């Protein structure tokens, strides 16, 4: 993969996160979008909390999963292929969904029950089955519920990004030129897309 392909992949994933965040009511607003590499990340979307939260609702968690899946969905929609770039976000999405089912009692099928406990970890000499405190049948149901939650979030993310292709393109054009976009500039993608700063941009394609 060449540098241009890598750059387009980074832009696709970063801008997608921002677009999804913008469309979801429980998520903190976008403060900054950048494609400048930071650590292992090729770029990032930064959100600033509007208030301190001690707890998170089911809606907040489901919408957070949708945000995590933004990069993967955008790769498929925009580039027509997927890469390993979204792997950490997919792991986060899966972990949130599993916690909803096994820790937070947010599964309709499995009910308000915590499955396993903090000591249910696999140590040397112990298999996963030995460490687990519930049956194979329950384990299968947990996997099904996790998949249902992730699939539902994926579908919602796909719907948002499909409806916001123009905003995706405009954000990409801006990032290709400037590399970093403030929250105020990003908001104008939705409120004032015909402003001079956007009309002067070259096409990203």
Would you name each region that the model predicts?
Residues 24-205:
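Soluble catalytic regions of large protease machineries
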Residues 1-23:
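Macrodomain-like recognition of ADP-ribose-binding/processing modules
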């Amino acid at each position: 993969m060449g540098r241009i392909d890598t750059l387009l992949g980074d832009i696709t994933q970063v801008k997608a996160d921002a677009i999804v965040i913008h469309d979801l009511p429980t998520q903190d607003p976008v403060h900054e979008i950048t494609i400048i590499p930071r650590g292992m990340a090729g770029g990032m979307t930064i959100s600033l909390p509007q208030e301190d939260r001690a707890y998170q609702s089911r809606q907040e968690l489901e919408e957070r999963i949708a945000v995590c899946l933004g990069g993967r969905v955008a790769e498929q929609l925009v580039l027509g292929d997927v890469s390993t770039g979204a792997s950490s976000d997919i792991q986060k999405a899966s972990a949130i969904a599993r916690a909803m089912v096994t820790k937070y009692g947010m599964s309709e099928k499995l009910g308000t029950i915590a499955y396993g406990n903090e000591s249910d970890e696999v140590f040397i000499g112990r298999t996963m089955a030995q460490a687990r405190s519930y049956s194979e049948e329950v384990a299968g149901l947990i996997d099904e519920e996790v998949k249902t939650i992730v699939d539902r979030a994926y579908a919602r993310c796909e719907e948002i990004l499909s409806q916001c292709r123009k905003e995706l393109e405009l954000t990409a054009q801006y990032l290709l030129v400037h590399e970093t976009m403030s929250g105020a500039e990003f908001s104008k993608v939705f409120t004032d897309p015909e402003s001079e700063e956007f009309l002067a941009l070259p096409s990203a394609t």
